[in-house]
Amino acid sequence: NPRDLEVAITKKEAAGASEEELAVLRARLRRIDGMVESNPMLGLRGVRLSVVFSDLPLMQVRAVATAAARLIKEGVDPRPEIMVPLVSITAEHVQTREVIERVIAEVSAEEGVELNIPVGTMLELPRACMVADEIAHHADFFCFGTNDLTQTTFGFSRDDAEAKFIPLYMHKKILKDNPFETIDTAVLELVRMAVEKGRATNPDMHFGVCGEHGGDPKSIKGLFNVADVDYVSCSPYRVPLARLAAAQAKLEAEHSA
């Protein structure tokens, strides 16, 4: 907590601490204050962290690649995939992928094994869906983060919205469903459009959805039959329900074909 650190500095000043010790603490406080954001949900997170703090992806990718290489040596067949989150600009993904591929190549040479790790994009912003055809030139797969996509499509902060007005909106029939539980038609259309754009650019891509919508039967039906995604992922306790809903969606699609 930066304010606790501020109090600690004041106490040390009063106690006559050395300037050298105080300088270290003041520098730390400035660093922390410099990272505080007014709206962190739309601030420095996701791929933006990798762009600003360029060492971050180096460490993360090296850890994944090294673990995969060592498992291969042990006779295991690991299948890691690396997903770049919160992309909204194609160049964000392109530059980050260049770093990822360089690190994978380095680890492959160091460990003496061939590594084939797909690199995809997490689409969770409306702009990313609009330029999905551009991003698809540089991605092996798309996964839709529909929680954040819902937040940024509606302009809702989920925690605030669910606590303060979504129940009232549902009571007044402004909203039929909680859009964080059942995917909204406009959000579903963004997913459908992005899948269509991505598949037109790269027919070999696979498309998935992660988040709570991946465990909601009504959402699953739309995601498979309208948006045409390949899979959904969800929390473990929702897996049986999700598998049943996915099977029902497939049967409905085959029956109506």
Segments and roles (model prediction):
Residues 1-257:
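Conserved alpha/beta-domain cores
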